Every structure is written in C-alpha cells, then in structure tokens.
C-alpha cells in the first residue's frame, strides 16, 4: 500500500502536530510496512500518544510507537483476520434458538426433495460452547436483556475494556463542580422537555436527496443575504459594494468564503463569492496579507473591508466579527424550575473488538446510581464503522439489534425515573443517513414509557425547563478543524474559534461544501438545521479530546465518546440551576460540568 507524505502531514495538522520531514518519511515507511493508509496510521499514532501521555512528536516517540504499539497490535489484527477468514462470522446478537430454527427449516426444505426412505438426517450443530451432545436450548426471556450474553451469545467481552483501572475518574471540570452533589432526583421534580423549531422542528421522515442545483444555490444565497442583513444592521453599514466594481477608496463587501480549487483552503486560494442582490453571485480572489488576524473556512458568511482598485482582486484590510443570536428568555412556565442534573453520553456503546454492549450496561448502572433528571444519549447505537458491521458478520437485522439495544436502555433505567432523550447519528447503520436526520421511530413504547422517553432529530434545539440545549451528533469540530485556516498575533484556542464560528454563523453545520460522507438535503437543512437562539449549553461530541468551554456565554461540552477503540471513554454530567432574575448581567444556568471516565 502506497502512502503520501503530504497527506500524512495534512492528517497530523488536523490534530495540531507539525512534523519534521524525516519523521514524515518514517511514517510513510510504517504505512507501507503495516498496510495502513494515512488516516489510519495517524489515528493509531494519536491513540498511542494519548494513552501514553506523550506530547509532541520525536524520533524516540516514533520508535516507541513502532515497537511497543504497531508491531503488537497490527500483527495481532492480521493474525486474527487470517484465522477468521476460514469460517463463518461470529453469531452475534441473535439467540441460538433462532439459529436452530433456521437450520431446521433448511432441513425440511431439503428433505422435501428426497425420497421418504432416506428419512430426515438433521445436521448436528457444534460450537465451542455447545459440543456434539444432545442439545437443550431454551428461548430467552425479556428479563435477560440486561445480560451481556443476550447481546452477543458467542462474543468475547473486550479484555482491555474490562481490565481498565480508571473508571469513575473525573478528567475535566467546569464551574462549581467541587461543591455539587452529583445525584439527581430521578425526574421526580417538574421536568419539561420541549423541542424548539427554526421555524419548525423535524418530527418524522421526509423525501430526501432529490434536489436540483438551483435549489441548493437558492439556500446558500438566502443564508448569505439573511446573515448579511443582520450584520449590516448590527455594524450600521450604509451599503455593500458589488464585488466586481473597481474603486479607489476602501469598500465593504458581503459574501461567502470559498476555495479557488477542489483542494484544501489556504491563504492563497481564498475567494469571496458575493450575494445575489449586490454582486449577482460573482467571485473575486482575496489577498489576506494585510489582515493581522483571521479565521476562515469554506461556507463562512463574512463582511470584508478592503481595496479593490481593479475589480479583479480584493486586498482585505478588515474582517467584521460575526454576531451570535440572543439567548432564550424563559417564560412564566419555566419560573418554578429550581435545579436539575443532566447526564450526556455519546456512542459507540461497544468496543471496537467486541459487539457485546458492556460499556452500555455500565452506563445504565451509572444512571441507576446517580438518578439524573434527564439523560441525553447520542448515537451511534449500532455503529456503521464497527468491524463486525462492515464485514457483515452479524446474523440479525440491524433494526432488530437497535430495538433490542433501545429496549435494554429503557427497561434498565426505568427504576431511576430519569427522562431519556435519544439523538440519532449518521453512523447509526439502521437509520436514514441524511442530514438533517429524522428522529428514531420506535412503536413499542408503553404508555408510561412515552412520558419518560423522547426521540429528537439530528440536529436539535431542546428546552429543559427553559434551559436551551443545542444537540448535534455530527463531528463538526473535526470537519471544521480540517478545513479552517487562521492567523493570530497571540495564542489562539482552536476549539474556541470553531465553536465561535458555529454560534456566529447561526447554523449547526455552516461548512460548505460539506465533508464527503455528509449527505445533506439543503431544503430541509434550511428549515431544520439553523439555531433558533444561542443555546445555553451546546453538546458537540467529537473524536477529538473532551473539553468544557465557555464561548460567548454558551457552555460548550464535548463529552467524548463512551468507548475509544478497545478501551473505555467518557461521558459528561451537568448541573443546572436558574440564576436569580434580579441580576443585570446574564448568568449561565449551567453552573457545573464534569467529564467522567466510564
């Protein structure tokens, strides 16, 4: 397998690592030696550096990575692949009884084509768990749902996950976390959950992906004009100048950032695409050399000031800052809200080397112990990127596996009294892979469970007793981080810049064109994927490192994922309390956050 040094350097830059040329060449050799592509190799390297607490990248770290990590892990993976290639896939997430019934139906069909004298010769079923003896198998009862074996009768639990020693460790905190008792009332209080629409909420499936290019163009143009109008009013700008109009004096232009080619944006390839009203959608190259500070990405709506003497190139001298939406104003119904605890977790809920749901069962135990008022659970619940899903080793329909997983969560947490909110993911293999993504459909809820369980769309703005949560399972931090270019005179926090873009662009996915694996229906995107207000709390799970940050008054939380490869990951818990109304300055209702290892 060949590897590109340039691609490796770009992958490393996504994680903020600059590498010497000699080390890049060494990584190229490792890619060829171990049969890895650039993305996979960098992912393994970052995982190694994170687990061993290494900072930076040196030749010693690279040698250690090769000898202690790659040679063991990848050779083991190749060995297991060769070993498994000679037999059928593991029988996961299906009862042995169902397998036996399938075998018997096949026998009946075969016997119908033979003469009666030959009789029925049933094939014996032999597995390591059930040798060739008289079999006695009973059907599963619903009470076995919480047993790991019910998810995967023949799968081996992950040894690395079960041998972890840091469970329950608080890895980062925010606010008054030390003085908070991290236990809720199990929904015993007055909990009100409402989905906010902009202008309406997505509640069901829709016809997707039949869109014409003019319709996409219309959505993008409307976005430029609407945001431009808000910024024009905020900064008291008299008028915008057409992009292609030559002028000797400084001009103010409105447009959307783009790239002059299909490659990654850089400071030499920036173009500004004008709005329809003033510039008829014209494009003009932008010279950023006069700007001391900037942060730009494709699809960003901006107002620039600069010199455009020829009408063919803008020398930018000023970049106007974006302006976020106002915060939600609580109503009288929200006035009796005192305090509540919210738990947030993001899938996958299985480790990469096993399809058993041990991490999910541990999370259920945490919920029953802490009794949070609300639990927000993000997909994927059955990960499309899991090895056994990709290799078609599962013997039960994806939909059935998901329903069993869902039933386990609902029944397993019923005693806690917690309200459950389920947010889908584009990596949920059974669900519609379109953005915005409709809520899960689950018709087996009892009347009592319907009061406690809520299915919302991806993305979604959710009000919990008047505290607005922005929810998205899409890894926007990773997507925007890979495309953003920036220049700063001082130290600049990359995550804070990206989060600020989300809030000031007023969209759950402001990047255009989107990442290749994103299937966006732009007509629905315009209706369902915009921010109605600036959320009090933005939950934005990512493969990147967990964090909690206050950005423009919004508490932004990356809870991490519940599993990271073969090891346990993290989840978050938040403590909400409505501040006193007599204060002149706004105070966040989210007073404390902790990110905890499962």
Curated annotation (Swiss-Prot):
Stretches with biased composition (Polar residues): 112-140
Presence of keyword Oxidoreductase: no
Recorded coiled-coil stretches: none
Modified residues (Phosphothreonine): 127, 130
Phosphoserine modifications at: 126, 141, 147, 152, 154
Subcellular location: Nucleus
Pfam families: DNA_pol_E_B, DPOA2_OB, Pol_alpha_B_N
Cellular component per GO, a single term: cytosol
InterPro entries xref list: DNA_pol_a/d/e_bsu (IPR007185), DNA_pol_alpha_B_N_sf (IPR043034), DNA_pol_alpha_bsu (IPR016722), DPOA2_OB (IPR054300), Pol_alpha_B_N (IPR013627)
Complexes and interactors: Component of the alpha DNA polymerase complex (also known as the alpha DNA polymerase-primase complex) consisting of four subunits: the catalytic subunit POLA1, the regulatory subunit POLA2, and primase complex subunits PRIM1 and PRIM2 respectively. Within the complex, POLA1 directly interacts with PRIM2/p58.
Protein name: DNA polymerase alpha subunit B
Species: Homo sapiens (Human)
